[in-house]
């Protein structure tokens, strides 16, 4: 704080950026507001023992990456985009129709978060949000997240740092995309 009432931020803790949307969803707290209040000299309005977690939140970091090229960045113009919205859906993003995904920054385009009173409700809400999200012009991590969220391994909580390799998620994604293409072809022929 400078001159009593002017705030200047040089850097905000990156851990807040990564974790705060889902932490806010399960705690009901606004961490950014609390951080600013603390910087303003105000005490926290609660004690640790008062905190209660509620429900389940899932965050998918929507990246401009090509899964089949070892997650290489995908850059360029984004002529059209649809951002999912609705109850218990949050999407923090810079995307808008006509924007450009630059090669000079991190590939993160959006943090898509969902909440539900149960894991299954949060998971199915995330699948709906991923199906509703559309980013034209660049490759994204959206199809991979759909494959992961639909996998029995994910549903059963069999998570690990080698999840993609251990459960052959890239191969499963390839199969899913092939089936999706076949289904679209069959639908077009039937029409």
Residues covered by each model-derived region:
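Short, small-residue-biased leader/transition segments that mark boundaries at the very start
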Residues: 1-2
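Catalytic cores of soluble metabolic enzymes centered on carboxylation/carboxyl-transfer
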Residues: 17, 21-191
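A short beta-strand motif that forms the metal-chelation/ATP-contact edge
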Residues: 6-15
């Amino acid at each position: 704080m400078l001159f009593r009432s002017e705030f200047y931020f040089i850097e905000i803790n990156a851990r807040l950026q990564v974790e705060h949307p889902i932490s806010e969803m399960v705690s009901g707290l606004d961490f950014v507001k609390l951080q600013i209040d603390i910087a303003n000299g105000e005490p926290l309005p609660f004690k640790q023992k008062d905190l209660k977690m509620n429900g389940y939140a899932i965050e998918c970091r929507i990246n401009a990456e090509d899964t089949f090229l070892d997650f290489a960045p995908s850059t360029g113009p984004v002529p059209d985009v649809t951002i999912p919205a609705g109850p218990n859906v949050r999407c923090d993003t810079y995307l808008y129709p006509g924007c450009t995904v630059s090669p000079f920054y991190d590939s993160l385009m959006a943090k898509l978060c969902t909440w539900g009173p149960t894991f299954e409700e949060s998971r199915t809400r995330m699948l709906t949000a991923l199906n509703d999200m559309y980013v034209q012009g660049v490759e994204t991590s959206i199809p991979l997240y759909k494959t992961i969220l639909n996998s029995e391994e994910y549903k059963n909580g069999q998570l690990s740092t080698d999840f993609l390799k251990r459960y052959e998620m890239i191969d499963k994604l390839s199969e899913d995309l092939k089936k999706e293409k076949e289904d679209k072809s069959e639908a077009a022929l039937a029409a």
